[in-house]
Amino acid sequence: MPFTLGQRWISDTESELGLGTVVAMDARTVTLLFPSTGENRLYARSDSPVTRVMFNPGDTITSHEGWQLHIDEVKEENGLLVYVGTRLDTEETNVTLREVLLDSKLVFSKPQDRLFAGQIDRMDRFALRYRARKFQSEQYRMPYSGLRGQRTNLIPHQLNIAHDVGRRHAPRVLLADEVGLGKTIEAGMILHQQLLSGAAERVLIIVPETLQHQWLVEMLRRFNLRFALFDDERYTEAQHDAYNPFETEQLVICSLDFARRNKQRLEHLCDAEWDLLVVDEAHHLVWSTDAPSREYMAIEQLAERVPGVLLLTATPEQLGMESHFARLRLLDPNRFHDFEQFVEEQKNYRPVADAVAMLLAGNKLSNDELNRLGDLIGEQDIEPLLQAANSDRDDAQAARDELVSMLMDRHGTSRVLFRNTRNGVKGFPKRELHTVKLPLPTQYQTAIKVSGIMGARKSAEDRARDMLYPEQIYQEFEGDTGTWWNFDPRVEWLMGYLTSHRSQKVLVICAKATTALQLEQVLREREGIRAAVFHEGMSIIERDRAAAWFAEEDTGAQVLLCSEIGSEGRNFQFASNLVMFDLPFNPDLLEQRIGRLDRIGQAHDIQIHVPYLEKTAQSVLVRWYHEGLDAFEHTCPTGRAIYDSAYASLINYLAAPEETDGFDDLIKSCREQHEALKAQLEQGRDRLLEINSNGGEKAQQLAQSIEEQDDDTNLIAFAMNLFDIVGINQDDRGDNLIVLTPSDHMLVPDFPGLPEDGCTITFERDVALSREDAQFITWEHPLIRNGLDLILSGDTGSSTISLLKNKALPVGTLLVELVYVVEAQAPKQLQLNRFLPPTPVRMLLDKNGNNLAAQVEFETFNRQLSAVNRHTGSKLVNAVQQDVHAILQLGETQIEQSARALIDNARREADEKLSGELSRLEALRAVNPNIRDDELAAIDSNRQQVLESLNQAGWRLDALRLIVVTHQ
């Protein structure tokens, strides 16, 4: 190689050293100094792994003093390059910059610069980069983005609500589905969409204290959203890092009590600039015109400051009209400001509901009915649609569906309230109760008597709680030596049941963690029964492992022993046998227990087994729940109301279970109250609201479409390719499970989203639902999204060289494969990627500028190529550098037409979609006051900003592959 003192070269193998300078040489060796690191390297002159750094007219370079030069001309003087051009900071022309004075920290970011500087990537990395660009662009344009990546069953009514609400600007809605229909999942889907699209970045979830961990687990396990749990300790700790502790995290969960009991803390919450507020159990916010509760006022303050609000609540019929109005008032105080007016409005929606029922019935409509429909919809050009709906034509059903949709839009609260009932949603199992009456052991009788004497001053409520758990009373007196499980007949019954049902999975729930732990030991030691334990003292990871062991079909645990609190938020639909070792204190907890199995998607009827001890509070409670509330075999929306009204009497019977006088009358009274309330709730059902909420056929199609996307084989191939190139170890464990672990030779030392000890993944939704320890990999999973970012945000795979063995072409024939990216820069919340995601445009040019890309498909072509080592590649580049420059210029002239076409299409699509949505809502605003002014203003502003950003869209070269034809 011809070396001269002062020349600048770059190492092919250690590009991180920066630019080197030739400082010494003899007949055989050359020494380079790399000023940016202060290191020297000695190379053999004949075959050194270095590449001469040479810039061309049009490039911009930096001097060692920091100023930049736009090159107009390149001269050579005594083997050294001199660059002549315009200095950018002073705009002085004909400035010279000798190569020896170039900045040594020079970074080559453009693909062509990296290629000419010898920074040549492996061929497989170039292919990965192109695929990443292609798939990322496709995924941005896919419908239902944000709905595909969650670890949930594809349940139509949930998807319908999430799809509708998740795409809105700052949604403010009430989610009021009946228990077991998945309000938490609906809220999570909405959050996932809003965060993924950039519509929201900061989210606050406020829940009752007992549900904090449930939400934390659900958001992480189902949606890969890592929330921070704020309590007193975390709040105090965060005060050291920021004036407002809540600004230290983007996603926060806290309890309602934590939020409201400290004035400064509430102010900090209000000042933290959240994008979305989620409030669970919002029906506990007590409100009246004269005296709203402190909890209600705290949420009201937040709702005034946060643009998007999701309230999760019991059904409106359970709440009562005034309480229901109070929730709507939080969402839109301008719209819902007068309770009396609201009551009147609700009455006026009956004709709309009747009209929808009429259309759904499918019968021919009379002229009066057609006229009434026309009046309700109130649009001038509605006549053809009415005629089509009332005809025998093929499009009659479509016309009826459209009329129903138009009526829905005009329905008073259909945009702010979503409510599904079990009657309106199919797919729930039956519940069958099996009670097992067992004798009260003498040991317990003695302990209860002594406890009664010693606890004479206890309140009736405390005595009632004690009487529910006689083993706890016994343990208090006997201490650690009290082996209650040796004589408690419930233990014998449980062992007998499990041994006679060895092939069935059984969930056992008891109130206390200690009970669960003691039962596990007994089952294991006495009968060798494989039992997993699940309680609040375990970490989330430990609970995951226990749940995964329980989920394993062949070698897994037969039984899972859960404590009351530990089981919150976990669902085990793959099991259908539930044993309640004891009973919870109120109907809500009873429903929560059954709800672990009684979920939509449960494939079998649920067998509920209740072994109870006679003459204890358990015997009282089992009768009251079953005979008084019918709470075991059916969901009980009336349970809390009746529990509150019968509380005093019930407590006395629980505290003194042997005194049964009048108990039958109490049960009868509660049952009558239950039937009356239930009939009242049924009569008050808003059928129109249910139709709107469950989505009908449209929701079914949505679920089916996402299910079809689940079968995308491109994802598996791409993910494996990505993991290989990044350097992540993959161990196939069978059953569609793969274990990923970091290796010692990864592309980056710490791959975001991959734990140090690795993780188990699956591409199958069904497997992910049954194995909580396995992460469900989709295009929306952080591992894939982080992998795409890792490849595309850097220069991995942006320049490479390949050989094409093809005897039909002359040896030395040169082809250049160019990948341009057409893109627009804009704030994430504009969601510009809906219209113009970063879009790759591939070109395959010969030296005459002929583009062969359409004739030569990428994957087919890529398989015909072979790799070149970096050293040989650098020599090839130097030999054909001038030809490559010429081809690049031809590429620049050709890309403009393709890019302009993409940008124009994106502009047209954005204008049509956003203008259409704005026009639709403006028209509806005249007949439905629930469409907010700020929502209309936001859509209009969004449209203008999107179109302006698309006007400024451009393109750039993202990757480059040089291909040389060989016959060997």
From Swiss-Prot:
Pfam families per the UniProt record, alphabetical: Helicase_C, RapA_C, SNF2-rel_dom, Tudor_1_RapA, Tudor_RapA
Keyword field contains Nucleus: no
Domain Helicase ATP-binding: 164-334
One annotated GO molecular function: ATP binding
EC number, UniProt record: 3.6.4.-
Enzyme class: hydrolase
Residue positions of motif DEAH box: 280-283
Biological process according to GO: regulation of DNA-templated transcription
Residues the record lists as binding ATP: 177-184
Key word ATP-binding present: yes
SMART domains assigned to the protein according to its UniProt record, in alphabetical order: DEXDc, HELICc
Domain Helicase C-terminal: 490-685
Keyword vocabulary terms for this entry: Activator, ATP-binding, DNA-binding, Helicase, Hydrolase, Nucleotide-binding, Transcription, Transcription regulation
Signal peptide residue numbers: none
Record's function text: Transcription regulator that activates transcription by stimulating RNA polymerase (RNAP) recycling in case of stress conditions such as supercoiled DNA or high salt concentrations. Probably acts by releasing the RNAP, when it is trapped or immobilized on tightly supercoiled DNA. Does not activate transcription on linear DNA. Probably not involved in DNA repair.
Subunit and partners: Interacts with the RNAP. Has a higher affinity for the core RNAP than for the holoenzyme. Its ATPase activity is stimulated by binding to RNAP.
Family of the protein in this entry: Belongs to the SNF2/RAD54 helicase family. RapA subfamily.
Protein name according to UniProt: RNA polymerase-associated protein RapA
Native species: Salmonella typhi
Designated gene of the protein: rapA
